[in-house]
Amino acid sequence: SHTILDAERNATYHSVHGAIQESRHVYMAAGLHQWMQNQPGAAVLNILDVGFGTGLNALLTLEATQPKPLNIHYHAIEPFPLNEQEIKGLNYCAALQRPNLALPFRRMHFAMENKPVAVSPQFALYRHSTTVQDFRYPQVFGLVYYDAFAPGVQPELWTVKVFKHLFNLMLARGILVTYCCKGDVRRALLAAGFRIEKIPGPAHKREMIRAVKE
């Protein structure tokens, strides 16, 4: 499955070892499915995606929740959205063998700023062209996908201050998942108030982090 290179930062939006595989492991299995297991019978889930990028996490979330009686409010932070040519080049719906998701996926990418778009009857997406540091919203989020570029590329996104800001946006028992398991990141999350779970990572990554607000 495709990934995209950000030439300015010399970093890819997803693992070069398979974008779909990585996102399913880190964000779906360790995040979304864990939240649903913890909150059986919940009717609504507010998700914050820090680093919308290619939109893959949103697409996989739509795929995973469509058959369930769960209303998703999906807030996507992306200060540098992809251009139309890059979006057209993404092959995720074909790779998933889900051509029926192609139109909803396109709706996600062309959503108006700060206005919900009904991707499906149970999935509303909100686009926020701001940085995580400047993002302001009520305390409603049960799940955070932290998919920013790595600390070596954007160290300013992996600080105690940023994680404390996210902590304050989340509900009790909320979950934050990220592919990064560096010691500095674990310590910053702990200092922000989270309980840390180190769990097996996707291919070519030994560990990842699931952080819980208790």
Please describe what each predicted stretch is:
Residues 192-214:
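Core SAM-dependent methyltransferase catalytic element
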Residues 1-45, 62-96:
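Rossmann-like AdoMet
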Residues 143-145, 172-180:
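Conserved beta-strand signature within the Rossmann-like core of class I S-adenosyl-L-methionine
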Residues 141-156:
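A short SAM/SAH-binding and catalytic strip from SAM-dependent methyltransferases
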Residues 55-59:
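Glycine-rich SAM-binding Motif I of class I
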Residues 156-173:
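A short glycine-rich, Lys/Arg-flanked "PGG" loop and its adjoining helix->strand segment in the class I
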Residues 86-138:
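S-adenosyl-L-methionine
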Residues 48-53, 78:
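Conserved S-adenosyl-L-methionine
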